[in-house]
């Protein structure tokens, strides 16, 4: 096991009616900006519950944050925060709203003579402070509710980049599984795929004898395999929704990634597909992951075989046959959730691969993976295999 420094300071308020504890998490004299997306939180009544919980407090609203939060939209919120002297941000929604709010939190305190896109260009390394934020989660997927990362898009340049900073880690997160009952099936399926791939990005790498982290990861994967499809069939099954919600949080709160090698190449290749073609984040992960595993089967051999046996109970055949079966089982799981796994399924013929590689190069994504050996040439082969 590698050395690690783990700090997970987000307070989690989990369960039915957890919103009741919201008010006491926010300073009583705060000027609060509630951020949300396209309006589903209004239709479902979640926003009304939040406003009721904060009745009597100084509250402003900012809606319209996109599924891939856009820098251009978020800068309008930054302007509002600065003008209105907002002192606390409350994100109400899924990972995109949370990620966008993290950017707002950091950008509002960024030096005014520097374009806040610099936050993405430097990966968040130069963030010195941020407005504190909390969240009310309505879509389990990204784990953004209890981590320090965010991904932001810039429409005008076709960029989608990530940043990390402890300054934007949510102070608290309200997780009520009931809020997920009304999610459209596509978002439920995407959330399961996202959480699944977050887990394997930290698990299917190379062995370092980290038994606790491995078994935590396997537990998350088995739970998603068991309850992910049930969440689609039984949308108001509280226990199923609770398990999926908690699995997504655990997949990316730092716990399973502590002391182990991490990959993240699937995410980097996927970000370029979203930025260029507008695919859902989870759709890009489902496209890239099986192709990447097939390409990197030799360097990932030990963990792919462990994954095959412990997650899919595949124990017969040669090493390569078991790896083939594990990749096929993963692809089949995504497909059964309704998330196709080839570029052609989305009407893409691969003609944009040179442009995708150019963007990877522009963003410095030329030595990806846990071994830093996924070069542009390897990325090209992965994209080609995903057609």
UniProtKB/Swiss-Prot annotation:
Which portions of this protein are annotated as coiled-coil regions?
Answer: none
Q: Which reaction(s) does its UniProt entry say it catalyses?
A: a primary alcohol + NADP(+) = an aldehyde + NADPH + H(+); butan-1-ol + NADP(+) = butanal + NADPH + H(+); 1-propanol + NADP(+) = propanal + NADPH + H(+); allyl alcohol + NADP(+) = acrolein + NADPH + H(+)
The biological process GO terms on file are: response to reactive oxygen species
Write down the InterPro entries for this protein, in alphabetical order: ADH_Fe/GldA, ADH_Fe_C, ADH_Fe_CS, BDH-like
From the UniProt record, which GO molecular function terms apply? alcohol dehydrogenase (NADP+) activity; alcohol dehydrogenase [NAD(P)+] activity; butanol dehydrogenase (NAD+) activity; identical protein binding; methylglyoxal reductase (NADPH) (acetol producing) activity; zinc ion binding
Recorded GO cellular component terms are: cytosol
**Stimuli inducing this protein:** Expression is activated by the HTH-type transcriptional regulator YqhC. Induced in response to conditions that favor lipid peroxidation, such as exposure to H(2)O(2), K(2)TeO(3), paraquat, tert-butylhydroperoxide (t-BOOH) and low temperatures.
Which residues, if any, are the signal sequence?
A: none
Q: What does this protein do?
A: Exhibits NADPH-dependent reductase activity for a broad range of short-chain aldehydes. Shows highest catalytic efficiency toward butanal, propanal and the highly toxic aldehydes acrolein and malondialdehyde (MDA), which are produced mainly during lipid peroxidation. Mediates resistance to reactive oxygen species (ROS) elicitors, such as paraquat and potassium tellurite, probably by protecting the cell against the toxic effects of reactive aldehydes derived from membrane lipid peroxidation. In contrast, Sulzenbacher et al. detected significant activities only in the presence of alcohol and NADP(+). They reported in vitro NADP(+)-dependent alcohol dehydrogenase (ADH) activity towards various alcohols, with a preference for alcohols longer than C(3), but the affinity for the substrates is poor, suggesting that these compounds are not the physiological substrates. Perez et al. did not detect dehydrogenase activity with short and medium chain alcohols such as methanol, ethanol, propanol, butanol or isopropanol.
Q: What is this protein called?
A: NADPH-dependent aldehyde reductase YqhD
């Amino acid at each position: 096991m590698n050395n690690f420094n783990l700090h997970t300071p987000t307070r989690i308020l989990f369960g039915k009616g957890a919103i009741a504890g919201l008010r006491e998490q926010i300073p009583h004299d705060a000027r609060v900006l509630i951020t949300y997306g396209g309006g589903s939180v209004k239709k479902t009544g979640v926003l009304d519950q939040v406003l009721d919980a904060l009745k009597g407090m100084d509250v402003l609203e900012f809606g319209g944050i996109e599924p891939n939060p856009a820098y251009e939209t978020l800068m309008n919120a930054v302007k509002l925060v600065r003008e209105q002297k907002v002192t606390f941000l409350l994100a109400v929604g899924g990972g995109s709203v949370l990620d966008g709010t993290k950017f707002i939190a950091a950008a509002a305190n960024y030096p005014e003579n520097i374009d806040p896109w610099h936050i993405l260009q430097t990966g968040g390394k130069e963030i010195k402070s941020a407005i504190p934020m909390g969240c009310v989660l309505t879509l389990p997927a990204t784990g953004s509710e209890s981590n320090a990362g965010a991904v932001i898009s810039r429409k005008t340049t076709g960029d989608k980049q990530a940043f990390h900073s402890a300054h934007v880690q949510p102070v608290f997160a309200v997780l009520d599984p009931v809020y997920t009952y009304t999610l459209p099936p596509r978002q439920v399926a995407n959330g399961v795929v996202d959480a699944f791939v977050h887990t394997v990005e930290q698990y299917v790498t190379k062995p370092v004898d980290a038994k606790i982290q491995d078994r935590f990861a396997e537990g998350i994967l088995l739970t998603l395999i068991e309850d992910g499809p049930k969440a689609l069939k039984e949308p108001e099954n509280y226990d199923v929704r609770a398990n999926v919600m908690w699995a997504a949080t655990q997949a990316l709160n730092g716990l399973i990634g502590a002391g182990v090698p991490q990959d993240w190449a699937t995410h980097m290749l996927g970000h370029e597909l979203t930025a260029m073609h507008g695919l859902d984040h989870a759709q890009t992960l489902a496209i890239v992951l099986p192709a990447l595993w097939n390409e990197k089967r030799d360097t990932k051999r030990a963990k792919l075989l462990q994954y095959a046996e412990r997650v899919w109970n595949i124990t017969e055949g040669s090493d390569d046959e078991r790896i083939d079966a594990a990749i096929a089982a993963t692809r089949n799981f995504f497909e059964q959730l309704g998330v196709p796994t080839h570029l052609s399924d989305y009407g893409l013929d691969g003609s944009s691969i040179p442009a995708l590689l150019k963007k990877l190069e522009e963003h410095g994504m030329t030595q990806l993976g846990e071994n830093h050996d996924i070069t542009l040439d390897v990325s090209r082969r992965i994209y080609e295999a995903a057609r």
